[in-house]
Amino acid sequence: MTTISVIKVSGHELDDPTFLGGLTAALRGFQQPLVLVHGGGKEISAAVERAGLQIEFVDGLRVTSPAVMDIMQMVVCGTINKRIVTALVNAGVKAIGLSGLDLGLLRCEPYRPAGRDLGRVGEVTAVDGAALLHLLALGWMPVIAPVALGATDGLSYNVNADMVAEAVAGALAGAELVFVSNVPGVLVDGRVVPALTPAAVEELIANGVISGGMIPKVRAALAALQRGASSVRIVNLAGLHDGGTRFTHGELSE
């Protein structure tokens, strides 16, 4: 099998009503096997508000009570996932919508950063890579919503979509991970840096060249490398096929 690409799109991007059409057109042109991981976005918060429940975030992670989990699962698995799958199928792509609950695809433990209890927020501990490879061998594109199965309690958990994408790419040996963003890549002096190593990233952060909202993006890229991805790119839709900034383990050739 040729190189697998795991493509992650955020809920923020999906909040743009024009984004899905552009994404569908771009993915239709790919020749290699693809796995798509997506986030949630404003629709989850809107549904939580309509239910009269509190919206709370800690370091970008949604505090998820059992009631909020029910709503999150309904929106991200039932509405957003199926919207994406419908668009892809209508474009001729053999897409299949899944969450981490299906086939026990993603298993997790409660995520407790710095000891904080975020409720039903999980951290992926296992991915059924064999199941994904089987679906890919059939010529299908798995579209994965970021809900995982608790490894010890059997409950559903809300998982950060970046973490899901990192874990999936790591489970598919040699896979490339592509983070689709609203920027064309890491910019230095207004130009996209085509390639970076972990050492170069740390130097650019220390020097203040990489700052603000780009820092968590590059940190996620480095985390994906550590989890086993062969390479990682940060791109926008225009650069989805071969553009953006590529992160690799080793030294870059001159």
Curated annotation (Swiss-Prot):
Catalytic activity: N-acetyl-L-glutamate + ATP = N-acetyl-L-glutamyl 5-phosphate + ADP
Family, as annotated: Belongs to the acetylglutamate kinase family. ArgB subfamily.
Compartmental location: Cytoplasm
Molecular function terms from GO: acetylglutamate kinase activity; ATP binding
Gene: argB
Site (Transition state stabilizer): K8, K217
GO biological process terms, semicolon-separated: arginine biosynthetic process via ornithine; L-arginine biosynthetic process
This protein's pathway: Amino-acid biosynthesis; L-arginine biosynthesis; N(2)-acetyl-L-ornithine from L-glutamate: step 2/4
Principal localisation: cytoplasm
InterPro entries: AceGlu_kinase-like_sf, AcgluKinase_fam, ArgB, Asp/Glu/Uridylate_kinase
Listed HAMAP family: ArgB (MF_00082)
The organism's place on the tree of life at top rank: Bacteria
Residues binding substrate, per UniProt: G40, G41, R62, N158
Keywords assigned: Amino-acid biosynthesis, Arginine biosynthesis, ATP-binding, Cytoplasm, Kinase, Nucleotide-binding, Transferase
Protein name: Acetylglutamate kinase
Spans through the membrane: none
Top enzyme class: transferase
Role summary: Catalyzes the ATP-dependent phosphorylation of N-acetyl-L-glutamate.
Organism: Chloroflexus aurantiacus (strain ATCC 29366 / DSM 635 / J-10-fl)
Pfam family, one: AA_kinase
Enzyme Commission number(s) of this protein: 2.7.2.8
Gene Ontology CC: cytoplasm
